[in-house]
Amino acid sequence: MYSRRYVACGLLCLLVIAIDQGHGQEHKPCTTPNGTAGRCVRVRECGYVLDLLRKDLFAHSDTVHLEGLQCGTRPDGGALVCCPAFVNEPNCGPSVFGVRIIGGNDTELGEFPWMALLRFQARNRKIHGNCGASLVSKRFVLSAAHCFTAAKSKGWKIHSVRVAEWNFMNHRGSKDCKQVKGYDVPICRKDYDVARFVQHPEYRVNAGVHVNDIVLIELAADVEYNVFVAPICLPVSNDTAQLPWGSSDDPEIEYTAAGWGSTESGKESTGMSYQLKQINLRAFNKERCKKLFQVPSGVGVGLGHICAGGIRDEDTCHGDSGGPLMEAVGGVWYLAGITSFGWPRCGRDGVPGVYTNISHYMGWLEREMFRGILA
């Protein structure tokens, strides 16, 4: 093994003076030595490489791996590295039933096959389904950080992530599979153990405003895809990365939220619905949203948020936390946000719900997804 000081310096120097790789590669697609898709970027723009350079101890294999990541140079001689990047799976975000303009209706079976349910174990060992989540790949699920902090405050711990759940009443007793009329295969709910979960390091609550309310959950095994289980797309492609999610006040921007949350407005409504519901929501003016959820000092509603809704009785509610706020682009569903917080009484006229803006966190997500798995 080598000391961090000497090897890190040597590697940085090596990366900086490597001028024989060819110019003009910056921001172009590339492939890491491990076969993972990536983008050719500056060293300082790649959190994955920076993490490697910060390691306390280096082995020879680390040096070889970093050398293999070089993908070109800039005109000034600075090195470019192939930074692993999340790539949507080819068939993500399927629009099974088309894009429907509705509000507060039951979903169709298999309509949002990326919906997942977080299950927590209480002190008495009873299992509770308590928050929604979104499947984004065979191994990763996204939800809200506050789902975990709220569970921890009650002495609960994460038990599993369930996919292919649609209607709790369809699986009464011990039945995990149910044959549904009109489908060739049964719908089979399945629970996956959690390998790790990464809460955003700067998550906090400021005067009721949840900031950086996002958690990445890695499953212990690959999810099996079928007609009832598939990932939603993330805003990483060229045609979606530049969409004005979270910053546009255009009321024509339309989202869809889904979850098992309460269907009754009011502070006392804290239960969950048996049936997976969906609701159509329009973008809400960000400046008005900031004033409604004004904080006395510090960080409040900002770039990391999307505000949507504001029409009486059309809102996400208790139990919807962690679930997806979705936008359809070209007939494909993308994860725009994560249900975060709102007014204590759901569905109040003129008051929107607030969602974590996924596009704002793509850099952090990519960094955490690839942390430690490529070296």
From Swiss-Prot:
Distribution of this protein across tissues and organs: Expressed by a subpopulation of hemocytes.
Domain Clip: 29-83
Family the UniProt entry places it in: Belongs to the peptidase S1 family. CLIP subfamily.
Protein name per its UniProtKB record: CLIP domain-containing serine protease B14
Post-translational modification: N-glycosylated. Proteolytically cleaved.
EC number assigned by the record: 3.4.21.-
GO BP field: defense response to Gram-negative bacterium; defense response to protozoan; innate immune response; proteolysis
Function description: Serine protease. Plays a role in innate immunity against infections by parasite P.berghei and by Gram-negative bacteria such as E.coli. In response to P.berghei infection, contributes to the clearing of parasite ookinetes independent of melanization, an innate immune response which consists in the deposition of melanin pigments on invading pathogens and parasites. May play a role in non-septic wound healing.
UniProt enzyme class: hydrolase
Domains: entry comment: The clip domain consists of 35-55 residues which are 'knitted' together usually by 3 conserved disulfide bonds forming a clip-like compact structure.
Residue ranges of domain Peptidase S1 in the record: 101-370
Gene Ontology cellular-component annotations: extracellular space
Position of the signal peptide: 1-24
Taxonomic placement: Eukaryota, Metazoa, Ecdysozoa, Arthropoda, Hexapoda
Gene name of the record: CLIPB14
